Regions:
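Walker A/P-loop
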Residues: 212-220
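PLD/PLD-like phosphodiesterase catalytic module centered on the HKD motif
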Residues: 1-209
Length: 220
């Protein structure tokens, strides 16, 4: 069994490894909580080339924290129409209060198996810049870690929704009304810091004074 530690700064990066996996695999199963088009596009070509070769591909992603974007889901839905060997499932509060937060990449090759697990979601920052840790295990024989992950993948697959146009529309409406919507991949690092005006500064000062005296509620 071979093992690798993968980051954005190791000799072989997580992204470069992922691209090689798609070039060699005969099947892949991905369970990734957060997927952004700006991240997906970094290896989209390799992934679609695998599907064109007839590789069986499955992905589970999630609406958890409203992070996955509509563009990625539309890409996956288009692939489902184009390739009978590709399927995508969507977690939308399928597990109640248990947030869907996995990052697992399973690949089957002609002569071996590979599992990559760690912290990396499919976002541009996660794949190019962030400090991320991932472990890859490759074995020519069946190993407990791969089997356990695949069993859990099947469990999750049976309890999540088929991705379709109606679910994408429902999620799009949810995003339009969402209170929390933050997209690191598109944050402008040069954007100006928000500074309170004079009236807001006075209100914040009064709130601090109330907190200091033990008051927990106030009207502004």
């Amino acid at each position: 069994m071979n093992d690798l530690f993968l980051t954005n700064y190791t000799d072989e990066t997580f992204l470069s490894r992922l691209k090689q996996c798609f070039k060699r695999c005969v099947s892949f199963s991905l369970s990734v909580s957060f997927i952004k088009k700006a991240g997906l596009i970094l290896f989209e070509r390799e992934m679609e080339e695998a599907l064109k070769r007839g590789v069986k591909g499955r992905i589970i992603t999630s609406t958890y924290q409203n992070f996955t974007d509509i563009e990625s889901l539309r890409t996956f839905n288009e692939w489902q129409r184009k390739y009978s060997n590709f399927e995508c499932h969507l977690d939308h509060v399928c597990f109640g209060d248990n947030g869907y937060h996995s990052k697992g990449y399973l690949f089957e090759y002609d002569d071996s198996l590979e599992i990559i697990v760690g912290s990396t979601n499919i976002t541009r920052f996660a794949l190019k810049k962030n400090i991320e840790w991932n472990i890859s295990l490759v074995s020519k024989e069946s190993i407990d870690s791969y089997n356990g992950a695949m069993n859990n993948f099947e469990f999750l697959w049976e309890r999540t929704f088929d991705l379709n146009e109606d679910r994408i529309k429902q999620y799009s409406i949810l995003l339009d009304y969402a209170i929390e919507k933050w997209d690191m991949d598109y944050v402008n690092p040069m954007s100006q810091r928000v500074v309170p005006n004079s009236m807001q500064r006075k209100a914040l000062k009064e709130l601090r004074r109330y907190r200091d005296t033990g008051v927990s509620r106030a009207l502004i």
